[in-house]
Amino acid sequence: MSLFTLFTLAIGLAMDTFAVSVCKGLAMKKMSLKKAFINGAYFGLFQAGMPIIGYFLGISFRNYITKIDHWISFVLLVFLGIKMLKEAFDNEACSTNDSVAFRVMIVLAVATSIDALAVGITFAFLKVNLLLAVSLIGIITFLLSMLGVRLGHVFGARYKRVAECVGGIVLIVLGFKILLEHLGILAQLF
């Protein structure tokens, strides 16, 4: 997987955490760089860690499904993208507080990184530099989560829906790209 594709994937995965971070920032009465940093650290670490777990899960059964591995990658990415698009249009308002306590953040970090676990499974079937992939995912998630807190505090929740839509579309496009390359319809562009 090329650097551009990994970068695009990392941005797509980070959109869920960005949206939650916007809500966190919205809930803050006073902007706190420390809270934004803690928020970004939780999300970045979990988004980077889950693909590693997914990768090793995928490796464990890769030999059994090598003939359909690209179809699995396609289905997982498209499913996650559609799920993210659906969530973008649910009329759920930001329902979080500004707490960065362990119990609050661990639940949010796990909930927003399940898609990263699924993407990690797809990494087992693709030519991916795992260290580079998880580093990009973690760093980009960390930075976008911190930015989300700031934007949420300054502008409110108006970017939440856009972020989730962008993330969903990116995951769907990557799913189709993987499938079309495997079928020989699309030469590796990126």
UniProtKB/Swiss-Prot annotation:
The keyword Transmembrane applies. It comes from the Bacteria. Keywords: Cell membrane, Ion transport, Manganese, Membrane, Transmembrane, Transmembrane helix, Transport. The chain crosses the membrane at residues 3-23, 41-61, 65-85, 106-126, 128-148, 166-186. Pfam families: Mntp. One of its GO terms (cellular component) is plasma membrane. The keyword Cell membrane applies. InterPro entries: Mntp/YtaF, Put_MntP. Probably functions as a manganese efflux pump. Belongs to the MntP (TC 9.B.29) family. This is Putative manganese efflux pump MntP. The gene is mntP.
